[in-house]
């Protein structure tokens, strides 16, 4: 399992105004718990955490937490990230201390490899799951699942049951959950609309021409008000 270093600052349990001030400074209030130890209140740099998780490609990565002003270093995993309900920005983080001898639950990202044969034939990928839930010892967790999809034809699909997990890792997600399907684009499925047929409102005259209210004159021509013209 990949790991990365994250700096943290100890904080006090403050008021709502104090927490709001932390966020204005780009810091996320966080808590570290686990291994029967007292909870530790900290704050971390929001951009640093986001960049680290993105670079490591998994929210289940093991982080080496370095507490500023001390020699304290802790191996932790991100357990929960709370987000603002409106802007969806992170506003609080829970970290769990890693016990190397105790299995943990983790979300492992799925990485698709190759271009499906069905896509080359004109199909498109319809995505399902992006991550798979697993259980295993922290040191054995894979950073991601690489899945070859180049063999998939039109109308084929791939489910969790098609994933092979490494030794010591159990997949918890339901096996019939769909990861992706190769489907025919909607534009191909729907027939093209035929051109509309224009309807003629009047009866045709002797030469095929109609007047404005449908009455024809003697030679097949109609005058403006539909009355028969003088011969």
UniProtKB/Swiss-Prot annotation:
Subunit text: Part of the 50S ribosomal subunit; part of the 5S rRNA/L5/L18/L25 subcomplex. Contacts the 5S rRNA. Binds to the 5S rRNA independently of L5 and L18.
Gene3D superfamilies for the chain: Ribosomal protein L25, beta domain, Ribosomal Protein L25, Chain P
Biological role: This is one of the proteins that binds to the 5S RNA in the ribosome where it forms part of the central protuberance.
Keywords from the UniProt entry: Ribonucleoprotein, Ribosomal protein, RNA-binding, rRNA-binding
GO molecular function annotation: 5S rRNA binding; structural constituent of ribosome
Family as reported in the entry's similarity comment: Belongs to the bacterial ribosomal protein bL25 family. CTC subfamily.
Protein name per its UniProtKB record: Large ribosomal subunit protein bL25
PANTHER family referenced in this protein's UniProt entry, alphabetically: RIBOSOMAL PROTEIN L25/GLN-TRNA SYNTHETASE, ANTI-CODON-BINDING DOMAIN-CONTAINING PROTEIN (PTHR33284), RIBOSOMAL PROTEIN L25_GLN-TRNA SYNTHETASE, ANTI-CODON-BINDING DOMAIN-CONTAINING PROTEIN (PTHR33284:SF1)
Biased composition (Low complexity): 207-222
Superkingdom of this protein's organism: Bacteria
SUPFAM superfamilies for this protein: Ribosomal protein L25-like (SSF50715)
Region (Disordered): 195-231
Gene Ontology CC entries for this record: cytosolic large ribosomal subunit
């Amino acid at each position: 399992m990949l790991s990365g270093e994250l700096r943290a600052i100890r904080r006090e349990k403050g008021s709502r105004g104090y927490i709001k001030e932390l966020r204005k400074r780009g810091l996320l209030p966080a808590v570290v718990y686990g291994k029967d130890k007292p909870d530790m209140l900290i704050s971390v740099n929001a951009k640093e955490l986001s960049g680290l998780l993105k670079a490591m490609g998994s929210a289940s990565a093991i982080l080496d937490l370095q507490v500023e002003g001390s020699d304290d270093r802790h191996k932790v995993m991100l357990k929960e990230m709370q987000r603002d309900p409106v802007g969806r920005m992170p506003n609080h983080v829970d970290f769990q201390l890693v016990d190397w001898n105790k299995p943990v639950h983790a979300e492992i990202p799925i990485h698709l490899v190759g271009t499906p044969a069905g896509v080359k034939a004109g199909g498109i990928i319809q995505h399902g799951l992006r991550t798979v839930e697993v259980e295993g010892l922290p040191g054995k967790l894979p950073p991601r699942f690489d899945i070859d999809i180049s063999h998939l034809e039109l109308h084929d699909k791939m489910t969790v049951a098609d994933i092979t997990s490494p030794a010591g890792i159990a997949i918890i997600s339901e096996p019939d959950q769909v990861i992706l399907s190769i489907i025919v684009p909607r534009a191909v499925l729907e027939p093209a609309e035929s051109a509309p047929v224009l309807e003629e409102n009047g009866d045709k005259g002797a030469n095929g021409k109609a007047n404005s209210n449908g009455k024809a004159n003697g030679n097949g021509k109609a005058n403006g008000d539909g009355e028969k013209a003088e011969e």
